[in-house]
From Swiss-Prot:
It catalyses: isopentenyl diphosphate + 2 oxidized [2Fe-2S]-[ferredoxin] + H2O = (2E)-4-hydroxy-3-methylbut-2-enyl diphosphate + 2 reduced [2Fe-2S]-[ferredoxin] + 2 H(+); dimethylallyl diphosphate + 2 oxidized [2Fe-2S]-[ferredoxin] + H2O = (2E)-4-hydroxy-3-methylbut-2-enyl diphosphate + 2 reduced [2Fe-2S]-[ferredoxin] + 2 H(+). Keywords: 4Fe-4S, Iron, Iron-sulfur, Isoprene biosynthesis, Metal-binding, Oxidoreductase. The keyword Acyltransferase does not apply. This is 4-hydroxy-3-methylbut-2-enyl diphosphate reductase. GO terms for biological process: dimethylallyl diphosphate biosynthetic process; isopentenyl diphosphate biosynthetic process, methylerythritol 4-phosphate pathway; terpenoid biosynthetic process.
Length: 317
């Protein structure tokens, strides 16, 4: 049984930065460090940080006065940010992915101008909640759509003054269909100057398409609440392949790979490489041969951690 590895796969720059922020805060200030929401959507990462003293919470009022708080990579609304700044916290660090912040700025700009904004995204996802929460102009409006059918039912105030943006971890193909529906219904709608779906999401989806050409089965390493990991599994399924989203090697069922000639392995943007290596080891135990790395798009983007975690401590304003 051949093992093929998608390339690129695993950690993106935003995830790497977010995890580094929590790790460095723990090193510099010691436990406990409070983090609003899971810093990234991966069970292994969250459990590892929890063991080191990170405490993951959902509401700001769960954080004691004098504590250190970190916002997750998914970003937060203006209301949550204001609530945190009003608290007597020692330090506040923002691990929001810079590419999510880019979308936040697009929404905030639309809000200032009074332009109605339509976000393409998944309801209930923390990134979507944070992005929607950047709009606060009652004269305008902020709307969420997930699929083309939502566009047909959407009622806006002014069809001539509309813009749209997207969640960063969506399916490129599905999002294109929704954008086509928006442009058909609202011909004057304006989109972002640069695609909101991030480079890592796009690259990993492109890589899984390549992987699915040769693999009979595709294993996607990623947690169930990881948006980008779910999209990878869906893409492989659409290619007609058996696809499974797994948290770890322990989830692999022997029946999935029995009699299979080629297994493809990829990982979502929040899944660490150690999990991929454990999956390869398990597949080898089930009859796999040495894993072959496919040729893919090179990624060399790095997002720096806040300067306070590089140089000196700065008190929260």
């Amino acid at each position: 049984m051949q093992i093929l590895l998608a390339n690129p796969r695993g950690f993106c720059a935003g995830v790497d930065r977010a995890i580094s922020i929590v790790e460095r805060a723990l090193e510099m200030y010691g436990a406990p460090i409070y983090v609003r929401h899971e810093v990234v959507h991966n069970r292994y990462v969250v459990n590892s940080l929890r063991e080191r003293g990170a405490i993951f919470i959902e509401e700001i009022d769960e954080v004691p006065d004098g504590s250190i708080l970190i916002f997750s990579a998914h970003g937060v609304s203006q209301a949550v940010r204001a609530e945190a700044k009003a608290r007597a916290l020692t330090m506040l660090f923002d691990a929001t992915c810079p590419l999510v912040t880019k979308v936040h700025m697009e929404v905030a700009r639309a809000s200032r101008k009074g332009t109605e904004a339509i976000l393409i995204g998944h309801a209930g996802h923390p990134e979507v909640e944070g992005t929607m929460g950047q709009y606060n102009n009652p004269q305008g409006g902020m709307y969420l759509v997930e699929q083309p059918g939502d566009v047909q039912n959407l009622q806006v105030k002014d069809e001539d003054n509309l813009c749209f943006m997207t969640q960063t971890t969506l399916s490129v193909d599905d999002t294109s269909d929704v954008i086509d529906a928006l442009r058909a219904r609202f011909p004057k709608i304006v989109g972002p100057r640069k695609d909101d779906i991030c480079y890592a999401t796009t690259n990993r989806q492109e890589a899984v398409r390549t992987l699915a050409r040769d693999a009979d089965v595709v294993l996607v390493v990623g947690s169930k609440n990881s948006s980008n990991s779910n999209r990878l599994a869906e893409l492989a399924q659409r290619a007609g392949k058996l696809a499974r989203l797994i948290d770890s090697a322990e989830d692999i069922q022997e029946a999935w790979v029995k009699g299979v000639s080629c297994v493809g392995v990829t990982a979502g943007a929040s899944a660490p490489d150690i999990l991929v290596q454990q999956v390869i080891q398990r597949l080898n135990e089930l009859g796999g041969v040495d894993a072959v790395e496919l040729i893919g798009r090179e990624e060399n983007i790095i997002f720096e951690v806040p300067k306070e975690l590089r140089v000196e401590v700065k008190q929260l304003d």
